[in-house]
């Protein structure tokens, strides 16, 4: 079970992710759509459980992989050559969508955009170098000759598409609920490794 970036999925899989069909609620497996998840009235007390719930979808996503082995390939002229053997990794992508997560991510982005607007007012090109995860990724220069930075609205709208989504890849046949429960507890496993690496001592070993 590994975390899978939705942004890095192939376009074919992305189309399935953003398609409304085949989503179900994680709590009871009832059918639900992304539109319903995005638009229900969260102030209605009857929707509290929905606000804390997730919509999920399971997508087959087999992929070719390098087996680390070699096989003999025979060409039409009779010549042979050893080439890397490819295998098929049978796996699934489990995608979830959360209204609560979507709103949280948009709140964070709004704060980043406010900081980006302040940075624009500095009008200092040397201070507007883009980073992959900082506020400067929302800025672009509209001139090739002079520094004329503006908000990159295309970049902002593209990033908004992924708000609320989370995905894991797995080759296990367990239920989506069980797999997601394990994935959500990954931080505990990572903490254990971190503690072991930090505080683990051993006596010298002589061979």
Q: Which residues does each PLM region occupy?
A:
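Anion-binding and metal-coordination hotspots
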Residues: 1-207
């Amino acid at each position: 079970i590994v975390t899978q970036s939705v942004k890095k999925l192939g376009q074919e899989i992305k189309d399935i992710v953003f398609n409304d069909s085949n989503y179900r609620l994680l709590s009871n497996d009832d059918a639900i759509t992304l539109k319903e998840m995005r638009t229900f009235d969260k102030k209605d007390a009857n929707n509290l459980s929905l606000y804390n719930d997730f919509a999920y979808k399971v997508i087959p996503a087999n992929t070719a992989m390098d087996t680390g082995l070699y096989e003999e390939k025979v060409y039409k002229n009779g010549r042979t050559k050893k080439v890397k053997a490819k295998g098929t990794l049978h796996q699934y992508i489990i995608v979830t969508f959360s209204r609560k997560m979507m709103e949280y991510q948009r709140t964070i982005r709004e704060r980043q955009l406010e900081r980006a607007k302040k940075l624009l007012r500095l009008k200092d090109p040397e201070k507007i170098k883009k980073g992959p995860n900082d506020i400067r990724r929302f800025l672009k220069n509209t001139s090739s000759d002079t520094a004329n930075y503006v908000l990159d609205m295309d970049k902002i709208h593209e990033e908004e598409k992924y708000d609320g989504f989370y995905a894991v890849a797995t080759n296990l046949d367990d239920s989506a609920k069980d797999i997601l429960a394990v994935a959500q507890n990954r931080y505990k496993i990572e903490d254990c490794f971190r503690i072991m690496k930090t505080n683990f001592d051993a006596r010298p070993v002589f061979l």
